Amino acid sequence: MAFKSDVIFEEIKERIATDKEMVKKVGTSFRMTIAGADGKTKVWTIDAKSDTPYVGDDSSRPVEIEINIKDSDFIAIAAGKMKPDQAFMQGKMKLKGNIAKAMKLRTILDPKMLKAKL
């Protein structure tokens, strides 16, 4: 089963390679474990901290923030139907690391910036 969020991560990969201002604003790294409806998981790493920004499935890279979230909840955030802080407060997003840095996820998942049709 493909994850609906894959299209979002592919778009983030494109943006992080071209939008140097966004990378500078975010300045941190995330490991996101996405859980599918079938119980399978997929890991994505977003590194907007290193000199060479990276988005992909290299789970060995060191990160500052670790996030666990269901694919459907991640899509709701990307679509603007739920804010990342709401997901955290409702227990839909588990977080390990600095919460202030984790809130920079808003910049990456800004629904106004995402082109993918959800």
UniProtKB/Swiss-Prot annotation:
Residues 5-113 form the SCP2 domain. It comes from the Eukaryota. InterPro entries: SCP2_sterol-bd_dom, SCP2_sterol-bd_dom_sf. GO terms for cellular component: cytosol. Keywords: Lipid-binding, Transport. Disulfide bonds: none annotated. One of its GO terms (molecular function) is lipid binding. PANTHER family: SCP2 STEROL-BINDING DOMAIN-CONTAINING PROTEIN 1 (PTHR10094:SF25), STEROL CARRIER PROTEIN 2 SCP-2 FAMILY PROTEIN (PTHR10094). This is Non-specific lipid-transfer protein-like 1.
